[in-house]
């Protein structure tokens, strides 16, 4: 509570009232009435402010004040008025004659609140504490469940986003890009992305077979991409052109050896491979002895067969790359004949 301006200008007393001050104030108000409270201290001969005189008269010196404890009727009336008006103590004091607002407030805070709580009534809402506690617990449970639902949905969305990010980062799972050891038939699988021709691959295969005496795994720089899936299936299901050519000239022994190498069996014996090379050489020598009339006749007999075979296989297998088939039919016939002629001469020289 703020003080009047006169309290700062004049040297006024503060604190407890003495009995002499109470007597002076009581005699003045009994004779003249209180009138204007700001002029009462000066007229009564008190070194107090008007507000202090008013509160002292209303709360302590007034003759109609009730002294002593509150009755049961007054307690019930205070509870009813507090339920209707709340903490408006001055309005409650007007309904209780002889009681001050300060006295009623002190009695409420010190006594009536505790009585209501012992009876199971909330002193603020004047309702049973059980229902209020249950409602508060329900509100708390609703808040907790809503927060848990929000957290669970957020965690599910995060997991879904992480799985989508991981799947997008991994990409399509076809084959490892750094695979170096592949099947022999994969060396003859041609597509639009592979720039090397089939003829170069066959020449490298023939040179490696003629120069090396030990079996080595066939390596290729061809790395299959997802768009080469059909070409890979085609090469794995349809018999290879190289297998058909060499089986036509060298017999079934080459086919069996190629199947063994396609299975990638690490237990292939070097001795068996050497015997297979000798059998192939004997077959080639037998073939050249029956056709020693002229080398041109061999080329004339071999080239149409090779060309026709490749043309039939390219047209029947429905390869997606028609340009490679046309190039195989037009430009690579002479290369195959020359390579076979070199191979025949090499085997013939080794036999001598």
UniProtKB/Swiss-Prot annotation:
InterPro entries: Homeodomain-like_sf, Myb_dom, Plant_SW-associated_TFs, SANT/Myb. It is found in: Nucleus. Keywords: Activator, DNA-binding, Nucleus, Repeat, Transcription, Transcription regulation. Residues 37-61, 89-112 bind DNA. Expressed in stems, flowers and seeds. Weakly expressed in leaves and roots. Coiled coil: none annotated. It comes from the Eukaryota. PROSITE patterns: HTH_MYB (PS51294). Pfam families: Myb_DNA-binding. GO terms for cellular component: nucleus. One of its GO terms (molecular function) is transcription cis-regulatory region binding. Residues 9-61, 62-116 form the HTH myb-type domain. Probable transcription factor. This is Transcription factor MYB86. It comes from Arabidopsis thaliana. The gene is MYB86.
């Amino acid at each position: 509570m703020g003080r009047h301006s006169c309290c700062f200008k004049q040297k006024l007393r503060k604190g407890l009232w003495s009995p002499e001050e109470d007597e002076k104030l009581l005699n003045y108000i009994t004779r003249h009435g209180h009138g204007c409270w700001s002029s009462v201290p000066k007229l009564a001969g008190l070194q107090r402010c008007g507000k202090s005189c008013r509160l002292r008269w209303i709360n302590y010196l007034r003759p109609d004040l009730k002294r002593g404890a509150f009755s049961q009727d007054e307690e019930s009336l205070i509870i009813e008025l507090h339920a209707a008006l709340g903490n408006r103590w001055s309005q409650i004091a007007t309904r209780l004659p002889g009681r001050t607002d300060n006295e009623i407030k002190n009695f409420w805070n010190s006594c009536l609140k505790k009585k209501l709580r012992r009876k199971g009534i909330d002193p603020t809402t004047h309702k049973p504490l059980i229902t209020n506690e249950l409602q508060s617990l329900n509100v708390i449970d609703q808040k907790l469940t809503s927060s848990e639902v929000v957290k669970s949905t957020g965690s599910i969305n995060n997991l879904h986003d992480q799985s989508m990010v991981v799947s997008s980062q991994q990409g399509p799972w076809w084959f490892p890009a750094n695979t170096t050891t592949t099947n022999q038939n994969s060396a003859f699988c041609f597509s639009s992305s592979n720039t090397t021709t089939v003829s170069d691959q066959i020449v490298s295969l023939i040179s490696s077979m003629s120069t090396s005496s030990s079996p080595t795994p066939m390596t290729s720089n061809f790395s299959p991409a997802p768009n080469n899936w059909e070409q890979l299936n085609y090469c794995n299901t349809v018999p290879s052109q190289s297998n058909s050519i060499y089986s036509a000239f060298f017999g079934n022994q080459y086919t069996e050896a190629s199947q063994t190498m396609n299975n990638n069996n690490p237990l292939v014996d070097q001795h068996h491979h050497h015997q297979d090379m000798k059998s192939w050489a004997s077959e080639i020598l037998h073939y050249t002895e029956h056709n020693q009339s002229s080398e041109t006749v061999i080329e004339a007999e071999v080239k149409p067969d090779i060309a026709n075979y490749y043309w039939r296989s390219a047209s029947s297998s429905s390869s997606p790359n028609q340009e490679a088939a046309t190039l195989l039919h037009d430009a690579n016939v002479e290369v195959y004949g020359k390579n076979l002629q070199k191979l025949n001469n090499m085997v013939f020289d080794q036999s001598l």
